[in-house]
Regions:
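Domain-scale recognition of functional cores that engage charged ligands
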Residues: 1-202
């Protein structure tokens, strides 16, 4: 934790950092650990579970439930969640997705936070690329049999059928929606979750 606190001291973070997480219980630990590092580095924090307490002030600025301006966040939320929101809006409208500065029901979306120009987000957008499992088949094709890689493909290939394989959603998290399949094509174990509609790697 000392190294993490040291990194925060040398960051461009503002004095107050909102720690954003969804309501998945597994994310509580990550949020609390980061909060401890931030406190050690001298920052004030507030953990936001979900988006329910966020809203806008009269000037259209994003605020938390205590009326504090939200302008610096560290998040456990996956960028993929924001992309899903963009896709959802894009399916209905042909214009660019607007970032809200108000809403009749005060409903704040994740994209209203993460894509606001004035909000400094710790976990930059480029982390989507190494964080997405779709890069694994590409790495395997570039570096086959590398000691730090497993045979991975976008389809079940002959080699995977021989050895058995795992089925994983490309942007899944927390061990959700994973199947373990034997070389006899029997499902040995599986987990449920909210990523069943995603494309898989094998």
């Amino acid at each position: 934790i000392n190294e993490l606190a040291g990194a925060w001291k040398h960051s461009r973070a503002r004095p107050f950092v909102h720690i954003m997480q969804d309501k998945d219980i597994e994310e509580n630990y990550h949020a609390q650990f980061m909060e401890q590092a931030l406190h050690q580095a001298g920052f004030e924090t507030r953990i936001l579970r979900g988006l329910d307490e966020l809203g806008w002030d009269a000037a259209g600025q994003l605020i938390d439930g205590e009326g504090r301006l939200v302008n610096c966040v560290w998040k456990t939320w996956a960028w993929e969640t924001a992309f899903d929101q963009i896709r959802e809006v894009s399916d209905r409208e042909f214009a660019a997705v607007p970032i809200r500065t108000g809403h009749p029901q005060n409903e704040v979306r994740l994209i209203d936070v993460l894509l606001r120009p004035e909000v400094l987000v710790f976990e930059p957008l480029w982390t989507v690329i190494p964080g997405n499992k779709a890069i694994l088949p590409i790495l395997w094709s570039l570096f086959p049999h590398h000691r730090y890689l497993l045979d991975t493909d976008f389809t079940v290939n002959d080699e995977l059928v021989k050895t058995g394989y795992a089925v994983k959603p490309i942007a899944g998290r927390c061990g959700s929606n994973i199947d373990l399949v034997s070389h006899h094509e029997e499902v040995l174990d599986k987990t449920s979750g909210k990523f069943a509609e995603q494309k898989n790697i094998y």
